[in-house]
Amino acid sequence: MARFPEAEARIFRKLICMRCGATNPWGAKKCRKCGYKGLRPKAREPRGGGR
């Protein structure tokens, strides 16, 4: 994806809330907006395909 590791770390070292979709910092235990504990890492590969 990114051309160098620093950029990749800046883009992908984030957690996404599975309830509200908010972006959270990497070390978070719960969502900053809704308090939900179900966080996933940001996807490195696109899903779907646009069709």
Swiss-Prot record:
Gene3D superfamilies reported in the protein's UniProt record: 4.10.1060.50
Organism: Thermococcus gammatolerans (strain DSM 15229 / JCM 11827 / EJ3)
Keyword Ribonucleoprotein appears in the UniProt entry: yes
UniProt cross-references to PANTHER family, sorted A to Z: 50S RIBOSOMAL PROTEIN L40E (PTHR39649), LARGE RIBOSOMAL SUBUNIT PROTEIN EL40 (PTHR39649:SF1)
Protein family membership: Belongs to the eukaryotic ribosomal protein eL40 family.
Domain of life: Archaea
Gene that specifies this protein: rpl40e
Recorded GO MF terms: structural constituent of ribosome
Single biological process term from Gene Ontology: translation
Descriptive protein name: Large ribosomal subunit protein eL40
GO cellular component: ribonucleoprotein complex; ribosome
